[in-house]
Amino acid sequence: MAVKKSVGSLKEADLKGKRVFVRVDLNVPLDENFNITDDTRIRAAVPTIKYLMQHGSHVILASHLGRPKGVTPKYSLKPLVPRLSELLGVEVKIANDSIGPEVEKLVAEIPEGGVLLLENVRFYKEEEKNEPEFAKKLASLADLYVNDAFGTAHRAHASTEGVAKYLKPAVAGFLMQKELDYLVGAVANPQKPFAAIVGGSKVSSKIGVIESLLEKVDVLLLGGGMIFTFYKAQGYAVGSSLVEEDKLDLATSLMEKAKAKGVSLLLPTDVVIADKFAADANSKVVPASEIPDGWMGLDIGPDAIKSFGSALDTTKTVIWNGPMGVFEFDKFAAGTEAIAKKLAELSGKGVTTIIGGGDSVAAVEKVGLAEKMSHISTGGGASLELLEGKPLPGVLALDDA
């Protein structure tokens, strides 16, 4: 994918007095009283917005929240305004809509360095359909476009892709730039030895990532529920562990492909098993080949943690996507937490450590080690598609550097 123009390349002359349409990702979790339970995504958007404010732009922010079907008050962006205002140090105004006369009036009133937040763009079905007329209406509000919403870059929506056709320059924000530098850079020309750790419950959702990474990595470590499909493919009994029966041949072919490519593919040698899927289940550690009937594997075992740790000690670049076990249950969180601690330790020794979105981000935050990693990706699906080597519509639409 070509290198894209970044907002950092735009100077005062390009920005002062200009109306800038910024697509951010403010899709944060809210509790039943509409309090923000995790403001990571809002904080991640701040550097780009502040840069535009400091250079005298009139800033127009657009985002989605959740998956509303039409106008749904519980998905309004209004609860985000106090936190956003606090982080930016200005009073952010919010519109009741994202297009139309009222919005145009509010845009005209934004002072230099001021910020207007549009209401949830997904209140219009035209947003997800990427309808040109809707994209044109959004674009008509501004002079130039900045996309800083990496988390939705894999979607060709009106505010992520359509708008870029009608506004020039169309550039990447700082967050988008950092995501691309790390994720594209790591996959295109990593410092070797390069290891990937892939976890999660299903092989099916990670096939593309595993196949793509097998072309690039020296070491591939597998954990999470997907390992039982690999064990069964090797003829092991897996008790009542999660298995995708229709993916057994695929698991075999991935192991063969790794061998042919000289990739060291490591599966856990032992697992923590449970007599039921629950936080208070009885548990014990057994070798991977000896899971008894009626028991299910819910985490990687202590030997696996040791051998994974040793394999990672020799690396220069590590990408991690997906937990090693059911880390939501403390009893089955040791594997995931051990990997997080190992990566934090390696970061301290100069290894590039990239947490590739999704549940692994939550896991790293749970153990309080987020700050220690080289890069934590904010995109779930977008990170996966990028690691699979797929082009992202929201990135392709931006100007080349």
UniProtKB/Swiss-Prot annotation:
ATP binds at residues 206, 225, 297, 328, 359-360. Mg(2+) binds at residue 359. The keyword Kinase applies. InterPro entries: Phosphoglycerate_kinase, Phosphoglycerate_kinase_CS, Phosphoglycerate_kinase_N, Phosphoglycerate_kinase_sf. It comes from the Eukaryota. GO terms for cellular component: cytosol. Signal peptide: none annotated. AMP binds at residues 202, 206, 225, 297, 328. Keywords: ATP-binding, Cytoplasm, Glycolysis, Kinase, Magnesium, Metal-binding, Nucleotide-binding, Transferase. ADP binds at residues 200, 224, 327. Its EC number is 2.7.2.3. It is found in: Cytoplasm. GO terms for biological process: gluconeogenesis; glycolytic process. Pathway: Carbohydrate degradation; glycolysis; pyruvate from D-glyceraldehyde 3-phosphate: step 2/5. GO terms for molecular function: ADP binding; ATP binding; metal ion binding; phosphoglycerate kinase activity. Belongs to the phosphoglycerate kinase family. Monomer. This is Phosphoglycerate kinase, cytosolic. It comes from Nicotiana tabacum (Common tobacco). The lineage of its organism: Eukaryota, Viridiplantae, Streptophyta, Embryophyta, Tracheophyta.
